[in-house]
From Swiss-Prot:
HAMAP family from the UniProt entry: Glu_tRNA_synth_type1
Protein encoded by which gene: gltX
Catalytic reaction equation(s): tRNA(Glu) + L-glutamate + ATP = L-glutamyl-tRNA(Glu) + AMP + diphosphate
InterPro entries named among the record's database cross-references: aa-tRNA-synth_I_cd-bd, aa-tRNA-synth_I_codon-bd_sub2, aa-tRNA-synth_I_CS, aa_tRNA-synth_I_cd-bd_sf, Glu-tRNA-ligase_bac/mito, Glu/Gln-tRNA-synth, Glu/Gln-tRNA-synth_Ib_cat-dom, GluQ/Sye
Record function comment: Catalyzes the attachment of glutamate to tRNA(Glu) in a two-step reaction: glutamate is first activated by ATP to form Glu-AMP and then transferred to the acceptor end of tRNA(Glu).
Annotated cofactor note: Binds 1 zinc ion per subunit.
Ranges spanned by the short sequence motif 'HIGH' region, renumbered to the chain: 9-19
Binding site for Zn(2+): C98, C100, C125, D127
The entry's keywords: Aminoacyl-tRNA synthetase, ATP-binding, Cytoplasm, Ligase, Metal-binding, Nucleotide-binding, Protein biosynthesis, Zinc
Cellular component per GO, a single term: cytosol
Amino-acid positions noted as binding ATP in the UniProt annotation, renumbered to this chain: K240
The protein's name in its UniProt record: Glutamate--tRNA ligase
Major enzyme class: ligase
Placement of sequence motif 'KMSKS' region: 237-241
Length: 471
């Protein structure tokens, strides 16, 4: 049997982390078994579906490198197919027209709730012999079995059973002629030969209805697996209140796709005590029986830890490609300075995100307007004039600009002055970067370049002179 899974988001908002995890699990399951993965856009909610949301879904999937073998399919382009099946069901008697008014249905609902009953359709039109005009508004309902039960073996949760008496006759076509979500899903899974439906636990109650429709059509029933929800660190359902955002916001905030994928796969799935998984390892190891039934809590600190790991473990060239986007967003021109690969090597240990790295690398490429106030107050004092003048002479004398020669110049200055490296290095750091923290001075000065370094030392010496004049 060819394995075939699908990811079927509704384009009513961004691709959130819960949806991304579902997509990842479906993708991994199919890839692990050599199957196919389908992308389907369930846009039947015409009032809420937007092109912007569709674009956000596609951008998120592409950024995460979750490629698909078929699609994207759009439900709004398949209405003729859905309605043709509904007409066949009307002819076969597995569906019927319902002419109940909104007023009758509302009164029924209120009466049931007043009696402590679960609101459900009472089947008024199910076996009605009443005649109605051809133009009288009606919906079409599925004739759900009234006896027995629906049992399915959830691949994460085990056997789940629903009594058919608990399931009312579902509307499958509205009065305006449009098919409903629960029906479209069934026909899509049938037509697209989906073998395994992996989705959120909020769809469990839809499953028995969908299975009954499939059986009425004589269609194969796929396997189902319902993934538990993701909670915030306070134990409540993850929402915007917890900072839950679309997948692309994580890109904007400086996270690598490899880090987010690694984090998402571990939100419910495990393989021993292993924490770090490449996409190749995930594909090789992923199985549904290792997915937990329990809800998972989203922890931003853990994601940052993983991101820092991948910044420093992936090839610098690969990280630099992602970094370039962030640098461009800040308007930094990198043509006059070190390659971004060097920035990754220099700042990787210090930065948890690429956004932080981009914001920290500006002094490698641009002149700064002013020194950091606290750093200058502490390190650009009159006492710093001598070490800055001395190290400038040695740096200016270098004919081969290497990290080793820069280091020797700084160390040699400290030795000649009989002071510790910090007495030279800290004023030099503030002079050439404008701030009080940076990577080691030898690699930083080397990356900034000889001419720019000497000019910045002059700027710092002028600053010290101005400071002296004001005292």
């Amino acid at each position: 049997m060819k394995i075939k899974t699908r990811f079927a988001p509704s384009p009513t908002g961004y691709l959130h982390v819960g949806g991304a995890r579902t997509a990842l699990y479906s993708w991994l399951f199919s890839r692990h078994l050599g199957g196919e993965f389908v992308l389907r856009i369930e846009d039947t909610d015409l009032g809420r579906s937007t092109q912007e949301a569709i674009d956000a879904i596609m951008d998120g999937m592409n950024w995460l490198n979750l490629d698909w073998d078929e699609g994207p399919y759009f439900q709004t382009k398949r209405f003729d197919r859905y309605n043709a099946v509904i007409d066949q069901m009307l002819d076969a008697g597995t569906a019927y027209r319902c002419y109940c008014s909104k007023e009758r249905l509302e009164a029924l609902r209120e009466a049931q709730m007043a009696n402590g009953e679960k609101p459900r359709y009472d089947g008024h039109c199910r076996d009605s012999q009443c005649t109605h005009g051809a133009d009288e508004p009606s919906v079409v309902r599925f004739r759900n079995p009234q006896e027995g039960s629906v049992i399915f073996d959830d691949k994460i949760r085990g056997p789940i059973e629903f009594s058919n008496q608990e399931l009312d006759d579902l509307i499958i076509r509205r009065t305006d002629g449009s098919p409903t979500y629960n029906f479209c899903v069934v026909i899509d899974d049938w037509d697209m030969e989906i073998t395994h439906v992996i989705r959120g636990e909020d769809h469990i109650n839809n499953t028995p209805r969908q299975i009954n429709i499939l059986k009425a059509l004589g269609a194969p029933v796929p396997e189902y697996a319902h993934v538990s929800m993701i909670l915030g660190d306070d134990g409540k359902k993850l929402s915007k209140r917890h900072g839950a955002v679309g997948v692309m916001q994580y890109r904007d905030d400086g996270y690598l796709p490899e880090a987010l994928l690694n984090y998402l796969v571990r939100l419910g799935w495990s393989h021993g005590d292993q924490e770090i998984f490449s996409i190749e390892e995930m594909t090789q190891l992923f199985t549904l029986d290792a997915v937990s039934k329990s809800a998972s809590a989203f922890n931003t600190e853990k994601l940052q830890w993983l991101n820092h790991h991948y910044i420093n473990s992936l090839p610098p060239e690969q990280v630099a490609v992602h970094l370039s986007w962030h640098v461009e967003q800040l308007g930094i021109d990198t043509r006059n300075g070190p390659e971004l690969v060097e920035i990754v090597k220099l700042l990787g240990e210090r930065c948890k995100t690429l956004k932080e790295m981009a914001e920290s690398c500006r002094y490698f490429y641009e002149e700064f307007d002013a020194f950091d106030v606290d750093a200058a107050k502490k390190h650009l004092r009159p006492i710093a004039r001598q070490p800055l003048e001395a190290v400038k002479v040695k740096l200016a004398a270098i004919t081969e600009w290497t990290t080793e020669n820069v280091h020797n110049a700084i160390q040699g200055t400290a030795d000649e002055l009989g002071v510790g490296m910090g007495k030279v290095g800290m004023p030099l750091r503030v002079a050439v970067t404008g701030v009080g923290q940076s990577p080691g001075m030898d690699v930083t000065v080397h990356a900034i370049g000889q001419a720019r370094t000497l000019a910045r030392i002059d700027k710092a010496l002028a600053f010290i002179s101005e400071r002296e004049a004001q005292q």
